[in-house]
Amino acid sequence: MNKNFEYPEIASLEQPAKKLVVLLHGVGSDGHDLIGLVPYIKDDLPDCHFISPHGIEPYDMAPYGRQWFSLQDRSPDNISKLLVKNISKLDDIIKQKQEELNLTNKDTIIIGFSQGTMIGLYLTLIQKEPFYCTVGFSGALIPPAEINNKTTPICLIHGELDDVVSVNEMYNASHYLSKYHIPHSGHKLTRLSHSIDGRGIEIAVNFICHTVA
């Protein structure tokens, strides 16, 4: 079996699942990282099946971890090329699980952290069928060459003290999304660096619960 299709997952409390939540980790981590969020949110999202895929490549700046794309060359043009090259592999992972659960994009929620937010936002904007909603923690938006989806609601959450991905990236993303009239909200969290805390989790859960497809 393709290793990309082996990852941590947690079934919905209510069966059958009505929603699929895809958790996308940051660079140098793996799917075991964000699956750790599930115990804090599953009671509020009882009809959601959670998957946390591993990045599709080995992390190329350490002997362990995974990545969605290389960050050795961080120029926007290079990252865009790598996203175009790699995005279909993530799409395939999601489509396989959707088929297994008899769900579609309109039932799918994307939650990303850091590099996971970057690829999650990119994936959201290129979909022909909109996702239910997308949450991005501590990330940045890399614009695709063409936007196919302008209707998926997006929630951006970022620590004001982030010294890995500046909180300015949240404002840049918000400016871009506003330009294309894409529904979104942005939340700057005081006294928070490059991480997810209880405030961010609460914001994300409230956003998901109040999103109307």
UniProtKB/Swiss-Prot annotation:
Pfam families from the UniProt entry: Abhydrolase_2
Hydrolase listed as a keyword: yes
Broad class of enzyme this protein falls into: hydrolase
EC number: 3.1.-.-
Protein origin, superkingdom: Bacteria
Keywords carried by this UniProt record: Hydrolase
Record flagged with keyword Hydrolase: yes
One example GO MF annotation: hydrolase activity
Active site (UniProt): S114 (charge relay system), D162 (charge relay system), H194 (charge relay system)
Family assignment from sequence similarity: Belongs to the AB hydrolase superfamily. AB hydrolase 2 family.
Protein name as catalogued: Uncharacterized hydrolase RBE_1307
Organism (species): Rickettsia bellii (strain RML369-C)
Taxonomy of the source species: Bacteria, Pseudomonadati, Pseudomonadota, Alphaproteobacteria, Rickettsiales
